[in-house]
Amino acid sequence: MLQLSSTAKRLGASLLLLLAFLVAYGFFVQPWHMRWGATDAEIAMALPGDPFIPPTTVVSTRAITIHAPSTQVWAWLVQLGQNHGGFYSYDWLENLFLAQMHNADRIVPEWQNPQVGDEVTMMANPPPMSIAKIALLDPGRALVLKGGWAFYLQPLDAQTTRLIVRYASFPVKGSWTAALFYYPIFEPAHFIMEAGMMLGIKQRAEAAMSTPAPKPNDPLLLLAKEARP
């Protein structure tokens, strides 16, 4: 009987592990993180930025409850961008890619009046693909970037706000090369950074309501529990 070489056995075992990972990711991990913290109603909700979403993209909807007034949350939200207050996520990780990111821990008055057409940069000296322009602005309620990254505030009461983030990927559907990069690499990385950003906004907005204001914690430590409605 023909026996498989040790190399063939290792290759077969590696392929089985890869297949198991892809199945686990596709059936369990991806469905969880694509709707992290969001309710069924929020996922089905029509939002003002939806017309900006290209049909070839993959869309996620994530949400988090913030125990602060929507006006307080908005003040942090409009500071997004490397050219302003950062993204409140893992700047040390972003800076590995020369983003020169610095996350603000205070409200800066000069950044509180964004306009449609203003640029939101993702890194220092950004190439065109790392610059997003504000496509739609509803002060206090909605901030939508061209290409389909949208942020919405839904007040639950005077002191509680839902932050809903809907994100459309770069074109993926119909392109195997784009899909091979997007699903195993970009999508999980973007989730970690976006969830960290949402937790960073939550911590800063809630800290502003406390006396004395605590320093924001590492968002990753709260990743699983803080997004619950």
Regions found by a protein language model. Name each.
Residues 1-9:
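N-terminal Lys/Arg-rich, disordered targeting/topogenic segments
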Residues 1, 44, 90, 217-220:
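Generic N-terminal initiation segments characterized by hydrophobic and/or small/turn-forming residues
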Residues 8-15, 45-57, 65-71, 78-152, ...:
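Glycine-rich portal/gate segments that line the openings of hydrophobic small-molecule binding cavities
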Residues 14, 18-61:
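Short acidic N-proximal helix/loop "leader" segments that mark the beginning
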Residues 29-35, 210-224:
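Exposed, flexible binding/inhibitory loops of compact, secreted disulfide-stabilized domains
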